[in-house]
Amino acid sequence: MLLSKNSQLILRHRKKFKTKKVFFSGNIQDDFPLSLSTMRTKINFHKYNDCIDFKKKIMNNNIVHNNLLISQEMIQNCDVIIYYWPKDKSEAKFQLMNIISCSPINTEIFIVGNNSSGVKSAPLMLKKWIELEKIDSAKHSILISGLIKKKAIFVLEDFFKTHLWKNLIIKSLPGVFGHKKIDSGSKLLASTFSNRITGKVLDIGCGTGFLSASLLYFSPDAILTLVDNNMYALKCSQYTLNSNKFNGKIVYSNLYSNVFKKFDLIISNPPFHNDLQINFNIIEKMICGAKKYLTKTGELRFVTSRFINCHFLLNKFFQKYYVIKETSQYKVYQAFYK
């Protein structure tokens, strides 16, 4: 089993956990929680595909959770928390404040992360509630720990950011693409929605719900289905739709994994990063699988960075496609079923 650098660092301290009831959360990227010897293990994932993949590897599905927020019930009877720091500090604070608000006093917490992700800011960020100390470091990762001395007050609504675009209200949580500002690529794609769009529309990787809200702004009769594998994104999309009095079906899905209908239009601003690394897998899978979910007059319309060459895949899977809009940074592609 290949372990991430963060998990390798925790492994060096495995003796600490043999008699402990351990709760794993955060940016877990491997199967290490299954191999660490503990008295009891619980795990919470925020991404649909991570949870499903993990459940396939174990007999006892009760230890694996897929919840937006940690609850006291979920974390009860655990005396140690192992938290994997994500790439975004605001997401880490959001998740850790939630955890600290639910955890009993004197619960021990271990935080591990890559130096480049901002994990070194954790002691200052959390000093009101935990006195954290560095206990180990290796291969550009750091492990810090401490005891929870005071419970945090956590209110979900306090972490939402609100963005405005063309009188639309866009709601965003930490860890969701477009949290700090509406992405320029998404705005470029949204600018192509000005002509009236009808029929069924699938929004892949819906994030904050910006694309769906923009489309419904111009085409209120369109029937939207929004999918994402991130629980935070789905919550944001629901808040965005509600804030603008729009309707849409919110579905937990890793690309097409939970999609069973055909659509007249598929829209997306697909990610090309996996954590801190560039990764084109999602773009490739989206293009390769699109025709299965399009009607015979259907269309795939997406935006991506102009340095990403999509021509080979579009030529392979679609009879005709066009670049319908572009800037110095982005291109919007339009591909037709036939």
UniProtKB/Swiss-Prot annotation:
Subunit description: Monomer.
Assigned protein family: Belongs to the methyltransferase superfamily. RsmC family.
Protein task: Specifically methylates the guanine in position 1207 of 16S rRNA in the 30S particle.
Keyword Transcription regulation: no
KW Methyltransferase (keyword) present: yes
Subcellular location, record wording: Cytoplasm
SUPFAM superfamilies referenced in this protein's UniProt entry, alphabetically: S-adenosyl-L-methionine-dependent methyltransferases
Organism: Buchnera aphidicola subsp. Acyrthosiphon pisum (strain APS)
GO terms for cellular component: cytoplasm
A GO term for molecular function: nucleic acid binding
PANTHER family: RIBOSOMAL RNA SMALL SUBUNIT METHYLTRANSFERASE C
Enzyme nomenclature, EC number: 2.1.1.172
UniProt xrefs under Pfam families: MTS (PF05175), MTS_N (PF08468)
CDD domains in alphabetical order: AdoMet_MTases
Keywords assigned: Cytoplasm, Methyltransferase, rRNA processing, S-adenosyl-L-methionine, Transferase
Protein name: Ribosomal RNA small subunit methyltransferase C
